[in-house]
């Protein structure tokens, strides 16, 4: 580095910890040397968040949050705004890809035991991020003012009316009116624009917490507690390598593959057969005509299936609402439900592995059932898979403590 650059960097470092931040979070942040395919999804989640924020701001420049103009403004963006169709499809495709990446990232956490000590708070921040993501997606779902988005929002907002005593007042407060209207659209647009920046702040906290406790790995072994000394530093973990350049370059390979898939979907199949963009949403909202079948967007369908699986009690859908929210909130207590002496799925016994497999099948099945029209048979299946979903968590203290585990090596494996 030239003397001039060194002098400029020194001037900055005296006023802002630029070099220290670079060292602490990149060049001298030591990550386990055995990170595999599953480690890609953290960086891909950041990438998709950036895509959503940038494209969302661009769309907001031409979108009209007005019940009489919203649908037309989306069509205007698609037809008359330069590259508007591309930005709109980037945003709609990015929303689904964001959830795909996050679901895989959370599954990685289950496989590696990334919710266990000392990462309980890291996991809980991640669950808060997931909740804010769902809220952001829900508020944004109404904005195109299409037929399915209108009636989907109507169904979800009506769930607040199921809350005893205050339900009716609560649903009116959420809508800002007695029905989904211009007032609802305005407040949903405001929240949809604001929440991604809150999400970015939570992601920052998530990364700070991660770098404080250190990255987990497929073996679930804490490299900070192992032997010290490697080719870069005598004080660094022996099984760690600098995040930069090793994992930044590796993540770039993942980004290239991801963007290739992203681009294929965006250019050749942006609706994904109605999963990413539903056909009724290409029709303007009609409050006087209810669609034959109302279903939320695919990343909400597991919880929607749980809602429909619970029969009403005294004419109220409140028990289903409780089950739906409990299915998400139970993730907060996961770190204290797992009593296994080992973290990683590699060394857990067959009972835990079978339980996790059944849990994954149940979640995917519920996602599919949530899209299907209601029927007695589908309701029965939803009830079975809902029970299996909750059994995974509620029975975990028992089967995780009884299961036979494999011996864990002292150092990470290659």
UniProtKB/Swiss-Prot annotation:
Transmembrane segments: 40-60, 84-104, 121-141, 154-174, 188-208, 252-272, 294-314, 317-337, 351-371, 378-398
GO molecular function, one term: ubiquinol-cytochrome-c reductase activity
Taxonomy, superkingdom: Bacteria
Cofactor note: Binds 2 heme b groups non-covalently.
GO CC, any one term: respiratory chain complex III
Membrane topology: Multi-pass membrane protein
Residues the entry annotates as binding heme b b562: 91, 192
Cofactor(s) needed by this chain: heme b
Compartments where found: Cell membrane
Annotated keywords: Cell membrane, Electron transport, Heme, Iron, Membrane, Metal-binding, Respiratory chain, Transmembrane, Transmembrane helix, Transport
Annotated disulfide bonds: none
InterPro entries: Cyt_b/b6_C, Cyt_b/b6_C_sf, Cyt_b/b6_N, Cytb/b6-like_sf, Cytochrome_b, Cytochrome_b_N_euk/bac, Di-haem_cyt_TM
One annotated GO biological process: respiratory electron transport chain
A Pfam family annotated for this UniProt entry: Cytochrom_B_C
Cross-referenced Gene3D superfamilies: Cytochrome Bc1 Complex, Chain C
Major site of localization recorded for this protein: membrane
Binding-site residues for heme b b566, renumbered to this chain: 105, 206
Note: Heme 1 (or BL or b562) is low-potential and absorbs at about 562 nm, and heme 2 (or BH or b566) is high-potential and absorbs at about 566 nm.
Task performed by this protein: Component of the ubiquinol-cytochrome c reductase complex (complex III or cytochrome b-c1 complex), which is a respiratory chain that generates an electrochemical potential coupled to ATP synthesis.
Family the UniProt entry places it in: Belongs to the cytochrome b family.
PANTHER family: CYTOCHROME B
Assembly, per entry: The main subunits of complex b-c1 are: cytochrome b, cytochrome c1 and the Rieske protein.
Entry protein name: Cytochrome b
Organism of derivation: Allochromatium vinosum (strain ATCC 17899 / DSM 180 / NBRC 103801 / NCIMB 10441 / D) (Chromatium vinosum)
């Amino acid at each position: 580095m030239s003397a001039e650059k060194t002098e400029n960097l020194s001037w900055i470092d005296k006023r802002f910890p630029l070099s220290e931040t670079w060292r602490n979070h990149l060049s001298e942040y030591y990550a386990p040397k055995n990170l595999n395919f599953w480690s890609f999804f953290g960086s891909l989640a950041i990438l998709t968040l950036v895509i959503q924020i940038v494209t969302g701001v661009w769309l907001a420049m031409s979108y009209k949050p007005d019940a009489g103009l919203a649908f037309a403004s989306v069509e205007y963006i698609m037809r008359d705004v330069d590259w508007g169709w591309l930005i709109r499809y980037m945003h709609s495709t990015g929303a689904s890809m964001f959830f795909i990446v996050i679901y895989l990232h959370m599954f990685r956490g289950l496989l590696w035991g990334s919710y266990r000590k000392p990462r309980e708070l890291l996991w809980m921040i991640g669950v808060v991020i997931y909740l804010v993501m769902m809220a952001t997606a829900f508020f944004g779902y109404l904005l195109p003012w299409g037929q399915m988005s209108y009636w989907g929002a109507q169904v979800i907002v009506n769930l607040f009316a199921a809350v005893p005593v205050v339900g009716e007042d609560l649903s009116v407060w959420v809508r800002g009116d007695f029905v989904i209207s211009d007032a609802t659209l305005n407040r949903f647009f405001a929240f949809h624009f604001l929440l991604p920046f809150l999400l970015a702040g939570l992601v920052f906290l998530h990364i700070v917490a991660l770098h404080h406790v250190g990255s987990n790995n497929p073996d679930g072994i804490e490299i900070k507690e192992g032997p010290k000394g490697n080719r870069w530093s005598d004080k660094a973990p022996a099984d760690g390598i600098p995040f930069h350049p090793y994992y930044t370059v590796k993540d770039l390979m993942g980004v290239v593959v991801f963007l290739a898939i992203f681009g294929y979907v965006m250019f050749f199949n942006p609706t994904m057969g109605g999963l990413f963009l539903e056909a009724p949403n290409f029709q303007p909202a009609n409050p006087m005509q209810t669609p034959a079948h109302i279903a939320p967007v695919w990343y909400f369908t597991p919880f929607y299936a749980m809602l429909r699986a619970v029969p009403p009690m005294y004419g109220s859908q409140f028990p289903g609402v409780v089950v739906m929210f409990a299915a998400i909130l139970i993730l907060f207590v996961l770190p204290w439900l797992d009593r296994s002496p080992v973290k990683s799925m590699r060394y857990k016994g067959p009972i835990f592995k079978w339980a996790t497999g059944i849990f994954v099948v149940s979640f995917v099945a519920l996602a599919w059932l949530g899209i299907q029209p209601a029927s007695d048979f589908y309701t029965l299946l939803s009830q079975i898979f809902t029970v299996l979903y909750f059994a995974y968590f509620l029975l975990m203290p028992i089967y995780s403590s009884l299961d036979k585990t494999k011996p864990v090596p002292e150092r990470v494996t290659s």
